[in-house]
Amino acid sequence: MCRCRCMAMMSFVAIVTPLTMLTGLIDWKYRYDMRKVPIIQRKVITGIVGYVFVVVYVVLHSLTDYSLAALAMALVFFAITGEYGGKLVHGARTLLCLKNLRKGSSQKSNPN
């Protein structure tokens, strides 16, 4: 019973994760002008790796019990991704790179 619920939840995650990644890329495009800030690069990489582990879990779930290791790794990578997202949203004032990024985008829109 528990395995069926877990499988259903991870199937939902496998469907929804690409949509959340797409909205993040759209936000990156319009808010940060697609600048390659290291924290954004790490967030994208950990999100993709977490998604790969979700797909591995969904595929291997019916074949082996080792799929739980993939589930655990997905949760770890999504937790790291969430930490980076929190730093972007709540810690933007303290991060020098994002402060410079904001100054660069405001100068771009206001040439004075």
Swiss-Prot record:
It is found in: Cell membrane. The chain crosses the membrane at residues 44-63, 68-90. It comes from the Archaea. The keyword Membrane applies. GO terms for cellular component: plasma membrane. Keywords: Cell membrane, Membrane, Transmembrane, Transmembrane helix. Its main location: membrane. It is a multi-pass membrane protein. This is Uncharacterized protein AF_0145.
